[in-house]
Amino acid sequence: MVRISKQAGNGMTRRGLLQGAAVGGVGIAGASLLPAPTASAVGASNGFVFPGVDVVIDGSHATTDVTLLVREYLARKSEADPDGTMTFFSRNPVTYIDAVLGWSWYDWDSLRTALGQFMPNWPKEGKSYPTRILGNSTGAMVFFTDTAGLFGSSEIRAVGVINFSDRRITRQIDYWDGRHFGISDTAKLRVPTDKFPADFRESTVGETAAQTMKNVSYKLARALRNGDGAGAADLFAPGAVFEDVPAHVQIVGPRSIGSYLTGTASLLPYSGQGTAVRHIVGSATGGGYEWTAADGSASRGVIALELDSWGKITRLTAMWDGSQADDSMLVSLSQKAIER
């Protein structure tokens, strides 16, 4: 069993401090003055630390049970323990796909074999740690970082779409930006196009997301598919934040978000007539959807959503493989964010 204490770390952001002060009565700032509680007694919204990494996990839009489960899972992975890591996976069904490289495993034994090959070569100080979790014990969006040396010379900052059944992972699909990892390094590791998995096996786990998350996801996807920036803007809360990670763009407020989505309707890979929802996970307050695109620079990705009590989007984070886009497209996406 991994013993993990709760404390305030230097990795805490201003946003996280404000959330900690607003939720749960005792803010993050005061947490370090209190005796360290047991993991089972700590609310996810109050923040959790991760062993060996100075970061506070944002679990404000996740249930406590899934935050604890993900933390235990990645802590065991960080110990480079193949057998311990595999205890978090279902025997059947199980799917693990890297959506950028095309690496895929469709049964427990092959995944165990792969971990047994990877993990002995990991640096002793290597970590795989979560930074933000959205969802519940049926499914969640997990923002996590694999430090340099685990799968290459650079770190990987990914969004894992994870389905659970009886506290075991039945499906995990990882999305990340190949530009952050390095375009040439990503290309070296990617499987040939004709070997890339076409079936991401969402049918093996079904659609278990909360109805609110499904409704918002489908409405947003429809607005984006139709290039309807104004319709998409109606789904956002007054102080909402839109962020596209590969494009390095952040937009605040429904009016500005709507204008940006209208102006980039022909540029964003998750916008336009060829796009569709692949799979949805999460609770009524946190989760999101995987998308596919028939045309454009990137053919797959994920949109993570944080919702308020009224079902409005307070934060949208888009993740896709920027190494599939040329420089001019990313420059155009940045230019469209300039308001006049």
Whereabouts are the PLM-identified features?
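N-terminal export leaders
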Residues: 14-21
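Short, solvent-exposed loop/helix junctions and linker helices
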Residues: 11, 60-64, 105, 210, ...
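N-terminal leader/capping segments at the start of a protein or of a new domain
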Residues: 18, 27, 32, 46-50
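Short, low-complexity N-terminal intrinsically disordered segments enriched in polar/charged residues
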Residues: 22, 41-83, 87, 182-230, ...
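A beta-strand edge to alpha-helix "cap/lid" segment located at domain peripheries
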Residues: 45-57, 116-211, 265-273, 278-340
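A solvent-exposed, acidic/Ser-Thr-rich amphipathic alpha-helical stretch
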Residues: 68, 79-139, 229-284
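N-terminal secretory signal peptides
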Residues: 1-12, 24-31, 38-40
